[in-house]
A protein has these predicted regions:
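Short, mixed-charge, low-aromatic patches
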Residues: 15-25, 59-66, 90-91, 114-124, ...
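Residue-level signal for beta-strand positions within conserved beta-sheet cores that form or flank
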Residues: 74, 116, 137, 212, ...
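Intrinsic-disorder/low-complexity, polar/charged segments
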Residues: 49-55, 129, 147-150, 284-292
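Glycine- and small hydrophobic-enriched segments that form the cores of compact globular domains
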Residues: 77-173, 180
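Membrane-anchoring hydrophobic helices of lipid-metabolizing enzymes
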Residues: 1-90, 96-107, 111, 133, ...
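Non-catalytic C-terminal accessory region of glycerolipid acyltransferases
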Residues: 2-10, 153-294
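Short N-terminal helix-initiation segments at or just after the protein's N-terminus
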Residues: 27-40, 61, 84, 116-125, ...
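N-terminal start-of-chain detector that recognizes signal peptides
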Residues: 48-51, 62-65, 92-94, 114-116, ...
Length: 294
């Protein structure tokens, strides 16, 4: 199947994956650290009782995210201009502040509005260990493939765009994706042209029609305090001073841990309306470069 390499798990695959995770000492250690005081046997029991990805999120993830919001923020709020149809699926495109919690907190806020959690675009550079790759696929993540040749990157972008169009149109499942590759180290949140071009690759119409099929909803995420600010500043400086600098696996793990557990102050998600009507106002005959800038 076209999407086998990048898709989340199907529900019928979960029992085997749960057993593999339960038997993994590294996963056991992380699970007990995230849920202190809860015996791992109780965690394993909740996993085995989950028959779907949705049930897994309800039984385990929702409570963890609520606790993280309580312990590490001074409040989590959603300000919305959008009137969302609960029968429709949307593509939430946001700035990127935290590797895990951007999409995690968004899902909590959507559930509180009576909406479904989102499928999440995640870079394969973050899938450092087998247990991480399994866990994110349980949590409705699909993979953005990195470190490819130019030709492979084009093929990967087309496949991912087709998957996103399929997910919105056929699965009726909303999606979250960041507006750029990686977090903005200088907080200059500019949407990358390459992301917009990728989104438009998957449909059968023109650029405007293809983008409209995704029901794009712009989203802004604000943390009063960024627990990873010093790590971002350090990386920004290293990239400036060392042209071939690359983050290590340990760097990624430290960023994930610090982002999860660090103090954030007030956290606000601001949601605009779906941009389909705005796209209708654009001149479809404009050259591609001008369309993406518009």
């Amino acid at each position: 199947m076209e999407f086998e390499e990048i898709r989340p798990y199907h529900d019928e695959e979960l029992p085997q994956v749960f057993e593999e995770l339960i038997a993994d000492p590294a996963f056991q250690q992380v699970a007990c650290a995230v849920m202190p005081g809860v015996p791992f046997e109780a965690i394993a029991q909740k996993m085995r009782a989950s028959k779907t990805k949705q049930e897994f999120q309800e039984n385990l993830c929702y409570g963890i995210l609520h606790k993280l919001a309580k312990d590490t923020t001074d409040g989590l709020i959603l300000e919305s201009m959008a009137v969302l149809n609960k029968q429709s699926a949307y593509t939430y495109v946001s700035n990127h502040r935290d590797i895990i919690l951007d999409s995690g907190f968004l899902s909590v806020l959507l559930v509180e509005q009576g909406l479904d959690t989102v499928e999440i675009a995640i870079g394969d550079n973050l899938l450092i260990y087998p247990w991480i790759k399994k866990l994110v696929r349980i949590n409705k993540c699909f993979t953005v493939q990195r470190a490819l040749t130019m030709r492979q990157m084009l093929e990967s972008s087309i496949r991912m765009s087709r998957y996103m169009h399929y997910t919105i149109a056929e699965k009726k499942q909303s999606i979250w994706i960041a507006q750029r590759e990686g977090r903005a180290k200088d907080s200059n949140d500019v949407t990358q042209d390459s992301v917009l071009k990728m989104l438009a690759m998957g449909g059968d119409g023109d650029i405007i029609t293809n983008l409209q099929e995704l029901n794009i909803v712009p989203l802004s995420i604000s943390y009063e305090y960024d627990p990873c600010d010093y790590l971002k500043a350090q990386e920004f400086q290293l990239k400036r001073d060392i042209p071939d600098y690359k983050k290590t696996t340990d760097d990624d793990l430290l960023n994930m841990q610090t982002g999860l557990l660090g103090y954030k102050g007030r956290v606000c998600f601001r949601m605009a309306s779906c941009i389909n009507e705005d796209l209708d106002e654009l001149e479809r005959t404009l050259p591609k470069p001008e369309l993406f800038v518009a």
